[in-house]
Amino acid sequence: MKRIFALVLSFVFLLSCLVLPAGAMFDPSPVYQVQAASAYIVNTDTNIIVYDKDSTKQVSAGGLTKYMTLAVLLTNYADQLDNTFQMPFAISDYVYNTNNADMRSNETFTYREAMYAMLTRNANEAAMGVAYTLAGGDLDGWVAQMNTLSQRIGTTASSWTDACGIDSGNTTCAVDMYLILRYLMSFDAFVEVSGAPSFTMPAKEKHRSSSVLVSQNAALSKASGGSYYRSAMQGGMCNVTAFKNDTGTQSYVSWGNKDGATYIFCVMDSPDSCDTFGYANRRPALFETVKLMDWVFDSFSIQAALDTDLTIAEIPVKYSSDTDTLQLYPNDSMMTLLPSTSDGTVTQKHFHLPDYVCAPIQQGDVVGTVELKLAGETIGVVELIAGQDVARNPLLFGVDKVKEFLTSLYLKVVLVLSLIAALIYGLWMLCANWNRRKPTKKIHRRY
């Protein structure tokens, strides 16, 4: 029952948040030229797509596959994270030389510790050990759960073939990773573990002392992150480890928060050459992520697009002797994403109003709506309400109704039909009178 309840809550949260505008509204190129093959940035407070570059382009998922393993774990076992399991020997060969957290077979771990290993070190053994244990050794069954849940979340370009990302058949895209991360962010345990710059793994059967797992997300650590560090970074994961002597592309999926505004950043297939920080371990996707993070938080803020205390429009009023017009006010200030250096006046307002309103009117009555656009994209629709009571003048109302009746189609039809009937009746009477005046012929009979 708890699993079902957790699943329902998670999907309610997800569906309430995923109504997105048609396209991205902003371009970072004046500040930074994105080199990734694809990217997707969304403000989760407003669901506004801030930046979109080939976001549906399918790419290799690599280590990001662990996000789907975590999604299955948290959907079904969120209340059992402190339960223990033994790292199975059966997965040893599969993860050989990729066991980034040194979690050895037959050692005992909690599922929460496995989460820390996955999210700090991208540990393949943690993902495979969790999947093997919870699926009762049926890894294909676990992968089937991953694909089923992925589709329920809304992904369209993702395919999962193992629990950790070693297999090259794991594919995804920037939009899909946004959906998956946003789903995961609905779990408190995920948010807490993702934000840890390090984790102390307790001593185990084959480890006499505890060990410290330092997060590969260098942006989380002020002490060791160097130029990558950003206080706004809340958590994230890379598809591959940092480059040193080799080359390639890298993807990073993360989220940041500053001054109450939250954004998800999905940067896919950044070339290693784009990292110009100069460290021996190059992190190109994280480099581009923090550059885009700087651009977003420096350029935009959540502001009120409308002032509910100011008149936004006027509309003619009929049947009132007190006023000819009615002042309209927005029913909501509509907090939205706007350039930091401007205010709500940068939006374009498109009013949807009747030609006039008729008294009586009560303050607060909804009269119409205003559609707000920014850079050609609709950012919201707000109701417009009456700013004051307007009483009806009975005389004006009566006179207008008489005029309305006298000019109505109904009266015109009645008059025309009456005229036609009168003409027909007149013709009939004329014919009848004519027939009466005509002399009758006498009939003579022979005898």
Model-derived regions: residue spans:
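Generic structural signal for hydrophobic residues
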Residues: 9, 145-146, 288, 292
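Positively charged n-region of N-terminal signal peptides that target proteins for export
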Residues: 1-8
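C-terminal segment of classical bacterial N-terminal signal peptides
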Residues: 14-23
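Short secondary-structure junctions and interdomain/linker hinges
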Residues: 15, 125, 299-303
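Domain-terminus/edge residues, biased toward the C-terminal soluble/receptor-binding domains
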Residues: 155-156, 168-176, 181-446
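Active-site-adjacent loops and short helices of periplasmic peptidoglycan-processing enzymes
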Residues: 22-175, 179-188, 193
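Membrane-water interface at transmembrane helix exits
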Residues: 15, 74, 131-132, 428, ...
